[in-house]
Amino acid sequence: MINSIQWEYIFNTKLAIESFPYVIKGIGYTLLISFVSMFAGTVIGLFISLARMSKLALLRWPAKLYISFMRGVPILVILFILYFGFPYIGIEFSAVTAALIGFSLNSAAYIAEINRSAISSVEKGQWEAASSLGLSYWQTMRGIILPQSIRIALPPLANVLLDLIKASSLAAMITVPELLQHAKIIGGREFDYMTMYILTALIYWAICSIAAVFQNILEKKYAHYV
């Protein structure tokens, strides 16, 4: 049975090799979306997590609502709203801009919860000690709590980046010329989507594997300081 399978219809090695240089051109947009969204999401997520932990209901409840909405709505729907929906109200984004905004806002919700969990896991005695020294809330947060929470938050934050790298393929649905979009073009021209999708999967796997190596390096580095 296995011997009768025509493997060239599943993965055409020649086509994969020949099309690789073209497909890899999309890696720039894949990395741009992933890393810029991660950076923006981290900044936004930090403020949202602090608002989420605030004693002021005026800050806490909007943060809760934001997190609930972004975690409950598929990122593809958010991309469609930004790219296809906003023009109806006179606001137009390029495909890349819509992708950056969508992924940044979405990842911020997950990062906010990661930050909140990491900050909450720091012993309460640290807060009490800082208070006895006369440190303000922000001085305590900046100088004592956040540095300790980094190591706790690092593994799940790295997973968010890996998820962003993989999810960036959804940007192809709004015509961003990233990896998957390039692969789809070749697949349609050569009538061989299977080969191109497998090739794309291998490229994503390679990118995520490299990112995982750096994740391990960072975790070991911060383990010495916390």
Swiss-Prot record:
Molecular function (Gene Ontology), one example: transmembrane transporter activity
InterPro entries membership: AA_ABC_transptr_permease_3TM (IPR010065), ArtM/GltK/GlnP/TcyL/YhdX-like (IPR043429), MetI-like (IPR000515), MetI-like_sf (IPR035906)
One GO BP: amino acid transport
Keyword Transmembrane helix found: yes
Membrane spanning residue stretches: 31-51, 73-93, 94-114, 160-180, 194-214
Location relative to the cell: Cell membrane
Membrane disposition: Multi-pass membrane protein
Cross-referenced CDD domains: TM_PBP2 (cd06261)
Assigned GO CC terms: ATP-binding cassette (ABC) transporter complex; plasma membrane
Record domain ABC transmembrane type-1: where: 27-215
Main localization of the protein described in the UniProt heading: membrane
Keyword field: Amino-acid transport, Cell membrane, Membrane, Transmembrane, Transmembrane helix, Transport
Protein family per UniProt: Belongs to the binding-protein-dependent transport system permease family. HisMQ subfamily.
NCBIfam families in the record: HEQRo_perm_3TM (TIGR01726)
Function: Part of a binding-protein-dependent transport system. Probably responsible for the translocation of the substrate across the membrane.
Protein name, entry field: Probable amino-acid ABC transporter permease protein YckA
